[in-house]
């Protein structure tokens, strides 16, 4: 293998694409079932009531309702408070 760089080459220029992590729905917002609430690596936020956790630790709403952030046994958690459905 060459140990000299050669004309106009560089050892830099590698970077990963942004992963678009973070909170997607904030406290007080209304969501439908299945909507993504938080994209994360690891469990920065834990699933609370009516919230599921995907294989990549993504939190999503299990029911339609209002998003609420709070503490669950000393950990940050996200819950969804179901909204009563008006009967037609």
Swiss-Prot record:
The gene is rpmA. It comes from the Bacteria. Pfam families: Ribosomal_L27. This is Large ribosomal subunit protein bL27. The keyword Nuclease does not apply. One of its GO terms (cellular component) is cytosolic large ribosomal subunit. One of its GO terms (molecular function) is structural constituent of ribosome. Gene3D superfamilies: 2.40.50.100. GO terms for biological process: translation. Keywords: Ribonucleoprotein, Ribosomal protein. It comes from Thermobifida fusca (strain YX). Residues 1-21 are annotated as: Disordered. Belongs to the bacterial ribosomal protein bL27 family.
